[in-house]
Amino acid sequence: MRRAAWAAAAFAGALAAQQAPQIPHVGYVYPAGGRRGTSVDVRVGGQFLTGAKTAYLSGAGVQATVTQYVKPLSGAEAQKLRDEMKELRDKKKASRKKPAAGAAPVEFTAADEKRMAVLQDALDDVSRKPSIPSIAEIALLHIDIAADAAVGARQLRLDTAGGLTNPIVFSVGELPEYSRKPVRVAPAYNVVNGATPANRAAPREPDPPVEIALPIVVNGQMTPGTADRYRFHAIGGQHVAIEASARELIPYVSDAVPGWFQAALTLRDAQGKELASADHFRFHPDPLIDYEIPGDGEYIAEIHDSIYRGREDFVYRITIGELPVITSIFPLGGKAGARTVIAIEGWNLPAARVNESFKGQPKGVYPIVLRKGAWTSNGVPFALDSLPETVAREGIGRREKAQKVKMPVVVNGRIARPGEAAYFRIDGRAGDEIVAEVTARRLGSPLDSVLRLTDAGGKQIAFNDDFEDPGAGLLTHQADSLLICRLPAKGSYYLQLMDAQNKGGPEYGYRLRISHPRPDFELRVAPSSLNLRAGATTPIAVRAIRRDGFAGEIALALRNAPGDFLLSGAAVPAGQDKVRVTLTAPAAVSLPLSIQLTGRAIIDGHEVTRTAIPAEDMEQAFAYHHLVAEDAWMVRVLGEGPRGAGWRAFDKPVQLRRGGATPVELFVPPRFQKGMQLALNEPPEGISIQSVTPKRDGVFLVLRVAANASQPGLKGNLILDAFREAAPDPKAAAKPAKRQPLGTLPAIPFEVVDGAAGK
């Protein structure tokens, strides 16, 4: 029989302090950015924001202050406002009448008029109910941006009575900004329904264009069936770039198809004639227009959702001006520590080439950014690796012209013309394991690669079109290719690379790694904002992204965390990609902490340590989930817990007998035993609780594994939720008993075995 003991005080803290959570959530911030050297007032829409008192913005040079929290009014509160408004209207009406004989005149004051305006604003908000509950609550913030603050995306979190919210993007820019008045969208026009079919076919007449001067960033929120327009003066010969940021601000919307604000841009002349339009840029959902102005005059930039949907969280920023824009680079990467000459394509650029070294930087992905005068370009990714590098030659589009390469190598090339292919010859021996990996789409290239490996006689050995990289959470079309195969015999082999859609052009660059396996791993931990009560325990999802066939166990540990945090079940089992572990909070209250999770594994006899990247598990269009990387893993401990509490959890995995039952003994303080029940939280298929029996100094738990379910060797963690069922009201005996959550216990490692369970 396996036994585990927990200190009584800690068990009390875990069960008593933790209740069913209402997780604070933010859905949008508007405006979603500001100019450095200025201050901006923003609205943050979300849910469970009660007690919002502090805002956290990543990076230096920005400071946010919560100025007000606005919760939607209840029906009774709204009626009270209506009654007060009626009294004031009656008073105003009476003040205009001649008073009756002997009666004092009714005086309607300036203060009364001001109060009516305040009431009208509040009642307007009541009549325009928020589209959905998840963005119904509002926090008002004042953000100061230093003049020397770095340009780029920051992450904004609110600290509420329920803890930290998820992060959301707030952009720091360098251009003048204009923001439209915030909007409210009625529920009938929510993002799922969008505009009516009639409005989609012929949207209502848009409001008059807003007059702006270039260069500028304009901020707005899209409403259903409408288009926002901006009029500006431009000079003939200017290359004006119009770039929308919408999906970049809010990557995924869970309750919409498509699963984001799909912005569409149109450029018109003064008479309304369409000059250019776009609803994407290559595979990027956010559109970009570059247009050479034909003559001096007035022009109109217009934005709308592609199917005329709209809601408060359909937030956009449009950058307009004769500004530097990088559209592609070549090569897409280089060797770490070596200088690389990079050719750059785009508009309004100061140079066509740059010489970069990224001296001292380890392998990874870094942005290439240019400045022209006072303005900064967009950033494009550039990859550094430690392997030897070469460039694909011209004229290797046929097998007999294949370029011979020696492993290991990274080939930098491009499919320069539609229908073109590139062939590479490698020599190997029987049993050699090789990896061929294309990195293109993950570096901003539109290439949709295909890899095919054949032997000298033309027989296909391996083929791959797309492979899914869980680390590329912002890509919905994973278009890069990966082959891992073992060569059947000694000889020459030919690797063909082409575009699956037979497209090509100078922007269709790629990096092709050809090598023996380089086993490695990455980690993601979610959510990126974690809230738990003092002394309580909560589950955490850890995802292992295994590279080049690495299948070993990964030991997990906390870094930069106070020693009284406890990580339980701290390992990703060999051969598995996911595990749920638990984190137990200390007893003391603390400010939000930025901590780290690390993973350690033995690879080819060497210890390798990787730091987990915090991520949000975002839902797209009701169905798809993506791990989107965030800047920090923030933990908030709430409330007071027992002092000096500690856990003593299982030191070895519980061995569960397949097709049988395994007893597990948990020590629980007597005062928690009465009526306490346990339930498995998202257990593996086939593992269940057979019985829970109170005993003098704990709980006797019997776990069962179905005979046809889990295979021997399966490892992981079991997470138990404790609860009580409250007796139903005697006056409403037909109603079922209510489950009262008590908390979550630290993870119990397990292993499924054949035969008798371990003792």
Residue ranges and their predicted role:
Residues 18-213, 217-222, 304-310, 314-315, ...:
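Ser/Thr/Pro-rich low-complexity tracts
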Residues 9-18:
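Hydrophobic h-region of N-terminal signal peptides that target proteins for export
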Residues 1-8:
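Bacterial N-terminal signal peptides that target proteins for export
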Residues 15, 571-574, 588, 654, ...:
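C-terminal segments of large proteins
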Residues 21-95, 105-106, 211-375, 384, ...:
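Acidic, Ser/Thr/Pro-rich low-complexity intrinsically disordered segments
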Residues 532-534, 646, 654-660:
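C-terminal luminal/periplasmic domains and tails of membrane-associated envelope-modifying transferases
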Residues 141-149, 343, 355-362, 542-545, ...:
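Extracellular/luminal low-complexity segments enriched in Ser/Thr/Pro
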Residues 131-135, 281-283, 293, 475-477, ...:
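Short proline/glycine- and polar residue-rich coil/turn motifs
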